[in-house]
């Protein structure tokens, strides 16, 4: 991945600023002509003379973006662009303000309106306190790093989070009746930029000066590999170059690949006969619409000939199971709980979308840079040919991860996913140990029906084991929701709440 970098934050005088990341790794564009390009779509919006650009809103780049096709527009963080058209939804047609009027499509979530609050690299908007703490506690953020976010409890107010020597401190940014903002009543400001500028110069009751906008661990996902992907995501295998085999399983292999000579991807190749192409495409069309920071994004498929290719985003460290068992996975309890919270976050989104994973396990969770974890392979278990599954595994389901009502009666629900999540918690806290050690699949089913549950592993906090037991309740309706599980894990270590300077000074 790219090296850690920093930039000056907004100073309220109209200078363009934008969000920073330390994950700037994207392979540079290369020999596009040697690789078959996507089928051309209708021409971009009509050319507009630069003299008329004054009609169009100006946006600023929040992250670097390297073009993936000839239709794209490359830009750097801080570059200014005219937005000519937003008709394509997640991909906007833009003209560069600074590079001889070059035009092309850009991902809309990589830019923000010039001089707006969203364009400030220290403004993160709607994120939780626990997310702010995790971001600021990353090793590349120094003491004095800060961010401002929307208040979780009071609409219209904000929260200021600052990295101190020993912890992250949180301050309420409140409003007076006249609309002015304050942290302490002795210092009031008309806009957030003024507040930030003031606390850059002096602490005035804060734990330290505001020195560095918070760096982010990764760029946001784009909506697919390219703008046409929303409608046309069946791609030719000639566009994919398989570089390195990452692993193999009972249904195929996983490769690191390069799409279109520009973009790193993961490619799952499925053994012939693993599933019906028609059923897979039907399920994949749903999977592709599921987008969340803690879900692996499905980019494209190749189904015209076997083996089927499933093209997704690439995660550096592979499966959580192998990560936990390897040298890189020697994690502290705080990190293990954070991994569990991330998985619960992705599953909470699937829960909201009324979507069932069916095969939740550490082997189907992937790990990237800076401890980022994402749920993978959601929905694939539904379209795997059951006879092939049974021939390879000796059972229709991975019994030790499967809820009893699903294993015995094929009743898969989000609550059966919750049961599986409890087993994932066991895998996490034991660094990838196989569940129900020493027991066969039939023995596991029999023991579970007799109310047996795995005991608390060594060095596992009782509170963590209690969450497992909640996931393994016999009555599916009595199991917690993933929303509840996410909250429980995010708040597992209750840090100090808001620090109110008015009460201290």
UniProtKB/Swiss-Prot annotation:
Main location, first listed in the record: cytoplasm
Domain (SH3) ranges: 54-116
Biased composition (Polar residues): 1-10, 18-31
Annotated stretches, region: Disordered: 1-53
EC number annotated for this UniProt entry: 2.7.10.2
Domain SH2: 122-214
GO molecular function, one term: non-membrane spanning protein tyrosine kinase activity
Residue ranges occupied by any Protein kinase domain in the UniProt entry: 240-493
Keyword field: ATP-binding, Cytoplasm, Kinase, Nucleotide-binding, Phosphoprotein, SH2 domain, SH3 domain, Transferase, Tyrosine-protein kinase
Keyword ATP-binding: yes
Localization, UniProt: Cytoplasm
InterPro entries xref list: Kinase-like_dom_sf, Non-receptor_tyrosine_kinases, Prot_kinase_dom, Protein_kinase_ATP_BS, Ser-Thr/Tyr_kinase_cat_dom, SH2, SH2_dom_sf, SH3-like_dom_sf
Catalytic activity: L-tyrosyl-[protein] + ATP = O-phospho-L-tyrosyl-[protein] + ADP + H(+)
One term under GO cellular component: cytoplasm
Keyword flag ATP-binding: yes
Entries under Pfam families matching the protein: PK_Tyr_Ser-Thr, SH2, SH3_1
Sequence similarity: Belongs to the protein kinase superfamily. Tyr protein kinase family. SRC subfamily.
Protein name, as recorded: Tyrosine-protein kinase isoform SRK1
Species in which this protein is naturally found: Spongilla lacustris (Freshwater sponge)
